[in-house]
UniProtKB/Swiss-Prot annotation:
Function: S-crystallins are structural components of squids and octopi eye lens. Contains relatively little if any GST activity.
Family statement: Belongs to the GST superfamily.
GO BP terms: glutathione metabolic process
Annotated Gene3D superfamilies: 1.20.1050.10, Glutaredoxin
Tissues of expression: Lens.
Key words, A-Z: Eye lens protein
The protein's name: S-crystallin 3
KW Nucleus (keyword) present: no
Residue ranges annotated for the GST C-terminal domain, each copy included: 82-215
GO molecular function: glutathione transferase activity; structural constituent of eye lens
Heme found in the keyword field: no
Amino acid sequence: MPSYTLHYFNHRGRAEICRMLFAAAGVQYNDRRIESSEWNGMRNQMPCNMMPMLELDNRTQIPQSMAMARYLAREFGYHGKSNMEMARVDFISDCFYDIMDDYMRMYQDGNCRMMFQRSRDMNSSSESRMRFQETCRRILPFMERTLDMHSGGSKFFMGDQMTMADMMCYCALENPLMEESSMLSSYPKLMSLRNRVMSHPKMCNYLKKRCRTDF
């Protein structure tokens, strides 16, 4: 097995799905958290000048959070067994990534704690919030129905086994639920799924011990 180094800021953000996959698989890795004071000096070392980035054996670099997550999910057995199962895990994961991406854009627009602020007009925060809310209205009902297709929604998206899709449901909705605890009130199966992910023995241990960050 290669040695892994995960490069990202000291946030959950777009790297958290990879951390959850490492935890679920019980695989050790170097969780390199970059401080803002370091970033400008090392930006050019990163593919596309962006993070997160997954490094294997100190030589192979994989950028783009979902490409990284899919690689790890395949390596660790959390990506489905057949091509059709993997396609299902992928579209579910991508749907939740859309929610997470819009939330992070909204957070960046509206929260001065964000490390990098874009120039913006006075309406950008409300516009990004409207986009996030519309994305949730579009995706969450579909995810509730998709979950219901396996065992009436009483297990995981792929049935008995937890996959990357279930972990994406957890991490994409974590911060939004902190802000609006009732956002899943119309989606009880998704809420129960998040509780099952939290209760998974390795996930439970990881969530208790991980670094505490704002997002």
